Curated annotation (Swiss-Prot):
Belongs to the class-I fumarase family. The gene is ttdA. Induction: Induced by tartrate, via TtdR. Tetramer of two alpha and two beta subunits. One of its GO terms (cellular component) is cytosol. One of its GO terms (biological process) is tartrate metabolic process. Its EC number is 4.2.1.32. This is L(+)-tartrate dehydratase subunit alpha. GO terms for molecular function: 4 iron, 4 sulfur cluster binding; fumarate hydratase activity; L(+)-tartrate dehydratase activity; metal ion binding. It catalyses: (2R,3R)-tartrate = oxaloacetate + H2O. Its cofactor is iron-sulfur cluster. Keywords: 4Fe-4S, Iron, Iron-sulfur, Lyase, Metal-binding. It comes from the Bacteria. Iron-sulfur cluster binds at C71, C190, C277. It comes from Escherichia coli (strain K12).
Length: 303
């Protein structure tokens, strides 16, 4: 067991690690996003689309060179944490994440995006009631912490929708729901977008799953072959809409479609859609019990 002084040192160290990582992902896209954008850029045939993709890559390089956020909307910070039951700072992790956000806000700097409901006052720290939002998965007999950081920008959050379908609507109803939302709303979400689809029982379970879906590496597939096929068919169909980069038409509309699912009630099909914009800022940090860490999402960047 750690002494109080040693524990405080460990808390300070992990806070600094997470703060630096959060600040870093505001300026650098994860490897898979950069690779996918390059693929779409090379495949684009419209002159306007080519110009926009060129501007996107110029923007990404300037963000790195100037060490400034790649988009002025650095989002509301969310954490999706898979932590072992034996991780030594499990009890302190919630407060560590909050303090890390406040420190990253100054380091990056990050735009102030936490407005208290009803008071309508911006806290100026990117923290507040329930913010940063943290989703927990506790892993038995494990002493690591995998921390996924996501910057939920306003534009890419606006298309988010969730609905409960009658079972008679079937998977055709799921497809219709996805197409209705992306075709009408994604144009203003800084496309090409990454589409997350959650399928479960209720609006809240489907919504959480849809958000988790856009945290997966682009191009990864659902373990169920039928779901994986639906991911590919949705991606192909949405790209035929020709929304194009920044909604000005082009060869593609999406960077990918990911589905996350959970067993449902026989009487309902809960479905939700979440989107990530082209500047999809998320990162995965694996922290070991001794506080050594691995940057799993940005292997071309150093903390």
């Amino acid at each position: 067991m750690m002494s109080e002084s040693n524990k405080q040192q460990a808390v300070n160290k992990l806070t600094e690690i997470v703060a630096n990582f959060t600040a870093m992902i505001s300026t650098r896209m994860p490897d898979d996003v950069v690779d996918k954008l390059k693929q779409l850029k090379d495949a684009e045939t419209s002159s306007m689309g080519k110009i926009i993709y060129h501007t996107m890559f110029d923007n990404m390089q300037k963000a790195i060179d100037l060490n400034r956020p790649a988009c002025q909307d650095t989002g509301e910070i969310m954490f999706f944490v898979k932590v072992g039951s034996r991780f030594p700072l499990l009890g302190e992790l919630q407060s560590i994440l909050k303090q890390a956000v406040e420190e990253a806000t100054v380091k990056a700097p990050l735009r102030h995006n936490a407005v208290e409901i009803f008071d309508e006052v911006n806290t100026g720290k990117n923290t507040g009631s329930g913010v940063p939002w943290v989703t927990w998965d506790i892993i038995p007999d494990n002493d690591d912490a995998e921390i996924e950081v996501y910057m939920a920008g306003g534009g890419c959050t606006l298309p988010g929708r969730s609905k409960v379908l009658m079972p008679s609507e079937g998977y055709e109803g799921v497809v219709k729901f996805v197409f209705e939302n992306i075709s009408t709303l994604a144009v203003n979400a800084c496309p090409p977008v990454l589409v997350g689809v959650g399928i479960a029982t209720s609006v809240e379970t489907a919504a959480v799953l849809s958000r988790k879906a856009i945290l997966r590496p682009i191009g990864s597939r659902h373990p169920n072959p039928k779901a994986a096929e639906l991911e590919l068919r949705l991606e192909e169909g949405l790209n035929r809409l020709g929304i194009g980069p920044q909604g000005l038409t082009g060869n593609s509309s999406v960077m990918g479609v990911h589905i996350e699912s959970a067993a449902r009630h026989p009487s309902t099909i809960g479905v939700a859609v979440s989107t990530g914009c082209w500047a999809h800022r998320r990162g995965t940090l694996l922290v070991h019990a001794d506080l050594t860490f691995e940057n799993l999402s940005h292997t071309r960047s150093a903390l």
